[in-house]
């Protein structure tokens, strides 16, 4: 499993630990990933995605999982999230006809 958020694309960053004497040693900054179940109102299904804590707040602020994923850019979504987005778009278009 990669250390990357499936909805925002946030991944591992690299930097330095800096001591009081200014010695620098390399370190990794890993995202705060959580495996969360999101419920889609349009598809009426539950999806389990690995997302960071900030993304959870962003989904709530956007008005739910469906609103967030429809608004999200396809370039940063994982392949699983893109498939979910296409499914939501397809069902939404079928309901509007």
Swiss-Prot record:
SUPFAM superfamilies: L28p-like. It comes from Rickettsia prowazekii (strain Madrid E). This is Large ribosomal subunit protein bL28. It holds the Pfam family Ribosomal_L28. The gene is rpmB. The keyword Ribosomal protein applies. GO terms for cellular component: ribonucleoprotein complex; ribosome. GO terms for molecular function: structural constituent of ribosome. One of its GO terms (biological process) is translation. Belongs to the bacterial ribosomal protein bL28 family. Gene3D superfamilies: Ribosomal protein L28/L24. It comes from the Bacteria. Keywords: Ribonucleoprotein, Ribosomal protein. HAMAP family: Ribosomal_bL28 (MF_00373).
């Amino acid at each position: 499993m990669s250390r990357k958020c499936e909805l925002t694309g946030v991944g591992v960053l690299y930097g330095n630990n800096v001591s009081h004497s200014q010695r620098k040693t390399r370190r990794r900054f890993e995202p705060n990933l959580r495996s969360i179940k999101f419920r889609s109102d349009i598809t009426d299904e539950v999806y389990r995605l690995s997302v960071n804590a900030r993304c959870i707040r962003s989904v709530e602020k956007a008005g739910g999982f469906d609103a967030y994923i429809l608004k999200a850019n396809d370039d940063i979504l994982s392949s699983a999230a893109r498939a979910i987005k296409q499914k939501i778009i397809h069902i939404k278009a079928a309901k509007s006809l």
